[in-house]
Amino acid sequence: MLQDELYMVRCLELARLGTGSVSPNPRVGCVIVKDGKIIGEGWHQKYGGPHAEVNAVNSVADTSQLEGSVVYVNLEPCAHVGKTPPCADLLIKHKVGKVVIANTDTNSLVSGKGIEKLKAAGIEVTQNVLAQLGRELNKRFFTFHEKQRPYIILKWAQTLDGFVARSNYESKWISNEQSRQVVHKWRSEEDAV
């Protein structure tokens, strides 16, 4: 595994920590590296709260180390003012040397604008590092912005003879414990059931 991929794996681990708290925003993690050492980490923790890049920058003990550092983030830094200021501007302000991204943000408010802003400021940008893993992590976000519909999971349990309930409507589990655990996990990840 390449060095960029190793740090991106860590970004994705951090991003997962936002599960259940950031929707409809995507799950995003950020790792800041200087001279081969991680100097800062962060993730988007709560909808409406600071983005991963802000939390990572704030975790750096000596912000002078940010100049020339490499920032790993699984989704393109935003370039618009929403509930928070643009993350691309923050990275430019701190004169980072390079930004490594898993996925371009397909939200029409961003959609490559963050990358353009970084490049225009002279920051090197590497894209598509572990892009498939990034898309899988944020498949709900990408489905919403690319297909203008929610991500859909169909869960169905039936007996071997095709029924979904007993003839007297008495309650009885059809699915097994393992299946119920998977469904419980799905429900914790979705915005509606």
Residues covered by each model-derived region:
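A structural motif shared across PLP-dependent enzymes of the aminotransferase-like
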Residues: 20-23, 27, 48-50
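Local cysteine-cluster metal-coordination motifs and their immediate loop/turn environment
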Residues: 43, 50-54, 71-90
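A short, small-residue-rich loop immediately preceding and capping a beta-strand
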Residues: 66-75, 99
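A short, polar/charged loop-to-alpha-helix boundary motif
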Residues: 45-58, 175-181
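Zinc-dependent deaminase
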Residues: 1-21, 38, 63, 82-193
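Acidic, glycine-enriched active-site microenvironments
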Residues: 2, 23-28, 67-69
